[in-house]
Amino acid sequence: MKKIIFVSHCILNTASKVVLYNQEEIDAEENLRIKFLNKAISNGIQIIQLPCPEFTLYGAKRWGHVSNQFDNTFFRKHCRKILEPIIDQLKEYLENEDFFEVLGIVGVDGSPSCGVDYTCIGNWYGSFEGRTNLQDALNTCKLVKAPGIFIDELKKMLDENNLTDRVKVTSLFAPEENKCLDIIH
């Protein structure tokens, strides 16, 4: 029986991530990402990469965002569109449980899109030009206990397809590394 795990796009392709600058956070996430992937590969787990909604909508040269910037009809519709084939794949694997075991889906906590338990919010909008309170706006960014928009839509689609009880959704998050490591067996 083949074991399968679905992962956020940047778990396999960090080039898709927005440019980061906090080296300590980068290193902690990278170490866990490598540990997670090594464990998955050494256990013979098949890895399916989810699409990145930010990259497929905004490309590589995008600014960092917070989840409340993505909490709109247009971004949610984009997420659903790119998730439709993923839901179809999940259903097909689950319908053939004699051959496949779906271990779950792994997001990336802290992401405005792919956070499972944690996402970032802030009062960010508007132009940078002439803005006198830019630092005040940037300082509103904080980590909160809530899903990112892509994962929120994914969970809704799992529920709409009666898959919620059959598909575990967890995350890669350096401060809580067992969340992603424990899903692999």
Task: Give the location of each predicted region.
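Short amphipathic alpha-helices and their capping/turn segments at secondary-structure boundaries
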Residues: 1-2, 31-46, 86-103
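Residues lining hydrophobic/aromatic ligand-binding pockets adjacent to catalytic sites
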Residues: 2, 13-28, 138-141
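N-terminal nucleotide-binding beta1-loop-alpha1 segment
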Residues: 4, 8
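Short, well-ordered beta-to-alpha junction loops that form the rim of enzyme active sites
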Residues: 10, 103-112
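Short catalytic/ligand-binding loop motif for oxyanion handling, primarily in non-cytosolic enzymes
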Residues: 15, 57-59, 111-117, 121, ...
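Short, glycine/charged-enriched secondary-structure capping and boundary segments
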Residues: 20-23, 119-123
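Short, surface-exposed acidic-centric catalytic microdomains
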Residues: 23-71
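Divalent-metal-activated hydrolytic enzyme cores
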Residues: 43, 60-68, 72-98, 126-185
